[in-house]
Amino acid sequence: MKIKKAVFPVAGMGTRFLPATKASPKEMLPVVDKPLIQYAVEEALAAGIKEMVFVTGRSKRSIEDHFDKAYELETELERRGKHEMLEYVRTLMPADMKCVFIRQAEALGLGHAVLCAQPVVGNEPFAVLLADDLLDGEPAVMRQMVDVYDYYKCSVLGVQQVPREDTRSYGIVASKPLKEDLEAVHAIVEKPKPEDAPSTLAVVGRYVLTPRIFHHLAHLGKGAGGEIQLTDGIAALMAEEQVLAYRYHGKRYDCGSKIGYLEATLAMARKHPEVGQQFEQLLLTEAARIQPREVLPTMLETTA
């Protein structure tokens, strides 16, 4: 069965970006001229997925508005003769793309958010994309993962190597190589301490899951952080189905952190067809003005 639906858990509070996220979802933070959620949706579209399922919380209405028709804006752009921008706005949501919005009544974790999508997803395999992770790949990372699913017909986790000291921030897999860039997962642990981590292969915000995951999520108790963890559901799923870890081809920007968000903005601005060249010149100009901070030699001595 083909992957036709993508789930976007967008109910998080975004506290690391306060006050910017006090009244606006973190998924609507712009990277140059597109919000994070649009990058994720475009990645799903590039994978041939047409039905987008957004699991939302309070103060998330702007996501729904973003993917809705904007008649007043279109009329104004047409009046001003801005036909190129008008066409761009009109194609923001392709005619064959469907959006469904589901409210997550309680913030009970990523696993619970995915479980909330079951009434819409039904008994089909599906993708999960976390907009916090902006993945820049060619072809699109979700396209790569769907291709893996189409061949093996089992759940696929997007993974990358991380420093051991960072394992406490990720779900970490233990696995055995199958072929280049693909591994068979035999264990997965949510946010282990560095000394307890089975490896440094971390799951990032991309998943292709079989519908059997819903059964396991529905029977889970609360795990790490007092939440229903998707990682725990995947661990239970492995007892009856194969789960693969795929080392995707592309660059990940962790836009859940301020530095990662700034890095993504810098990278996307440099690639932008309208402002890229000017932005690179601006970077060179600003770099020439930067003076070494007094604390830098001390930091270098400490790490030497």
Task: Annotate the PLM regions.
Residues 73-76, 89-175, 209-211, 217-220:
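Conserved beta-loop-beta/alpha segment of the NTase-like Rossmann-fold superfamily
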Residues 8, 54, 128, 157-158, ...:
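Structural beta-sheet core signal
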Residues 28, 99-101, 155, 243-245, ...:
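Conserved beta-strand scaffold positions in the cores of enzyme catalytic domains, especially
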Residues 270, 276-295, 299-302:
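Catalytic, metal-anchored helix/loop core of enzyme active sites in primary metabolism
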Residues 5, 50-52, 98, 125, ...:
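Residues at the starts of beta-strands that form the adenosine-phosphate
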Residues 2-79, 140-144:
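N-terminal glycine-rich phosphate-binding loop and ensuing alpha1 helix
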Residues 127, 146-150, 177-281:
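Catalytic-core segments of class I nucleotidyltransferases/pyrophosphorylases
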